Amino acid sequence: MARRFQEELAAFLFEYDTPRMVLVRNKKVGVIFRLIQLVVLVYVIGWVFLYEKGYQTSSGLISSVSVKLKGLAVTQLPGLGPQVWDVADYVFPAQGDNSFVVMTNFIVTPKQTQGYCAEHPEGGICKEDSGCTPGKAKRKAQGIRTGKCVAFNDTVKTCEIFGWCPVEVDDDIPRPALLREAENFTLFIKNSISFPRFKVNRRNLVEEVNAAHMKTCLFHKTLHPLCPVFQLGYVVQESGQNFSTLAEKGGVVGITIDWHCDLDWHVRHCRPIYEFHGLYEEKNLSPGFNFRFARHFVENGTNYRHLFKVFGIRFDILVDGKAGKFDIIPTMTTIGSGIGIFGVATVLCDLLLLHILPKRHYYKQKKFKYAEDMGPGAAERDLAATSSTLGLQENMRTS
């Protein structure tokens, strides 16, 4: 065991491998070798250079987004009467940026005021005062309990609370949605981007979009792919959802703006690509999107509020992109990597020659030659023997 270890160590320390060129005339190996080289060449030129643009250096972007909406809706509700809803009423927040909500449906509890009343049965049902702990508020409570058990309606008793009365009852969601006209509302997106590495700035109001065109155009993925004005119904439709269904309980829609620019061409070819994605799943545990807000007012010295439970569509605008431009350093790096990949052909063909073909032992003898230093005079004797062999071969060819 020790002797073998010494031999392995000596071989590692004192042996040197040098390549040996062997010309092999074998049609099968030759064809495989050229086919592998062809595949590597197509990969380097077609994929690495042309598709992945390995000759370019790239830069990410910084972005700013602002939006404006337009449209009107009319409702007729008990306690509120006829009401016209404009952009100041149905958009949250008022200063739209890359994330905003358009109200499409709501439940209103009119003229709430601070006082005592029975809480909603969702907060808990009682039979007597002992079931209502004073001052205690459960998770779904709508006020502070007074300790009394009072009638909520003719059949149910609940704990009395001190809070905004009458309490909200949101069991029945209006169908169809109250602001179904939102399907025809229009959304104007302004997007400014910059590629700081290349000092290039662009807006989605590209050269083809002018003032006259913007007054009449609506985005369409084939007819008007650069128009920055979008109809909400079309956006929801392209996201794979139904607007009427989505408007009832609300949902989330993603709008992506992709800037993938090749700056080796003129900058006017750097244009945005819009895509729409449905981020709402009706079958999940908590479907829809909703929140609450209140309108406060004073009447005869008493503070009142109209409480709105709002169902709306939330739009999230996401900007992504990358720009590329020719650079000698990544070009040379890619070329060097491609040349290195050509070595795969040699490795595979050596594997075929030395381990798979029937004549593999013969090729091994031709491929590998072992030389050992035999001391002074050994080189001269080996050279003389080689010369004699070559002379004999020459005489045989001429005879």
Curated annotation (Swiss-Prot):
Residues reported to bind ATP: K68, K70, T186, S286, N290, R292, K309
InterPro entries per UniProt: P2X1_purnocptor, P2X_extracellular_dom_sf, P2X_purnocptor, P2X_RECEPTOR_CS
PTM annotation (Phosphoserine): residues: S387, S388
Note the PROSITE patterns from the entry: P2X_RECEPTOR (PS01212)
Where would you say this protein principally sits, based on its record? Answer: membrane
A GO molecular function term, named singly, is: identical protein binding
Which positions form S-S bridges?
C117-C165, C126-C149, C132-C159, C217-C227, C261-C270
Protein biosynthesis: present as a keyword of the record?
no
Which sequence ranges are listed under topological domain Extracellular? 51-338
Q: What controls its activity?
A: Activated by low concentrations of ATP (<1 uM). Undergoes rapid desensitisation. Sensitives to the ATP agonist:alpha/beta-methylene-ATP. Modulated by cholesterol.
Domain note = The N-terminal 20 to 23 and 27 to 29 residues seem to play a role in the cholesterol-dependent gating of this receptor.
Q: Which family does it belong to?
A: Belongs to the P2X receptor family.
Instruction: State the name under which the record lists this protein.
Output: P2X purinoceptor 1
Q: Which organism is it from?
A: Homo sapiens (Human)
